[in-house]
Amino acid sequence: MSENRKLLEMNVPMWFDGKSINEALFCEDFLRTRQIIFANGAFFTPDGRVTDDLPLRGEIFEELKYCAVNNIPRKISNIIEIMKLAAHVEDFPPEQDRIHLANGTLMLDGTFTEGKPDIVRNRLPVFYRPDTPKPVLWLSFLNGLLYPEDIPTLQEFIGYCLIPSNKGQRMMVIKGNGGEGKSQIGAVLGQMLGSSMKDGSIGKISENRFARADLEHILLCVDDDMRMEALRQTNYVKSIVTAQGKMDLERKGKQSYQGWMFARLLAFSNGDLQALYDRSDGFYRRQLVLTTKEKPAGRMDDPDPVSYTHLRAHETDQYL
């Protein structure tokens, strides 16, 4: 009886010969039972972009741990690199007509499909419930923070941030004197968008040519406390706000490449976003500026009020 036949009868996987692992065969077998692709420098699954490969490494370890092989951590790293080749697809364009949610996909025409049958770029960690009541606490918070005519503008901008598209060609700046509670908007959006939102700095984006690459695959970048210094350069910021499709991205120590860019910019500030040298209409025309109401005299502040905690935990599903 051949060695391979003995292994089959022992229910040993074909990628293990009893002594060593055939990494290419392992990847082929692994990918046969899982939905995963590698595109644009990242792994994607039905749950969206893989932002932390530790769970993936854990799955691989569960397959390997019964095989007596040396240096399993290095073996797993090798398998991850081979998987990038085995699961590679040339491109994975964003889908601008739908929002992928925890319990299905909502099309922009209002139709909803349950489940996660397809691999997607972004999946938001909130549920779509068409019969959910109005988010009363959220609306009350907005009524106390913004003027009535500005609330629909904020709501539309938030809706705009749910799809991977920069067609609106606008960023938003919400300014106030401080202490109004405007940064709670960022906390709520973080609950809605999950790993599709990133904390960042408008100043860093304007100065650092590598900062744009950090926004690849991201739906929204929030600057929670925008610096008041006027921007020396505005071209990087404007290029993100007006991006249509792919743009040139660069990471430190690596050759530049073409990557999809659809990150929107939202900043909270005590003043206007100014440019030191750019006096063109284009820079200021791209900004939606909202001014908060004055902080009520005698209001007692709580850095993490129970009501806002409840809002972030229970009402984020109701925005949709």
Regions found by a protein language model. Give the residues of each.
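A short beta-strand-to-loop transition that corresponds to the Sensor-1 phosphate-sensing loop
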Residues: D225-M226, A263, A267-D272, K293-E294
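P-loop NTPase catalytic core of nucleic-acid-dependent motor ATPases
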Residues: L31-G58, E95, I99-H100, T105-L219, ...
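Long, basic/Gly/Ser/Thr-rich N-terminal segments
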Residues: D53-T105
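Substrate-gripping "pore-loop 1 plus following alpha2 helix"
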Residues: G200-I205, N235-Q255, P303
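Conserved AAA+/SF3 P-loop NTPase catalytic/coupling segment centered on the Walker-B
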Residues: L220-V241, Y277-G282
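AAA+/SF3 P-loop NTPase mechanochemical coupling elements
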Residues: F210-E216, L249-F268
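A short helix-turn-beta junction within AAA+ P-loop NTPase domains corresponding to the substrate/partner-engaging
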Residues: S280-K293
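Conserved small/polar residues in nucleotide/adenosyl-binding loops
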Residues: T309-T316
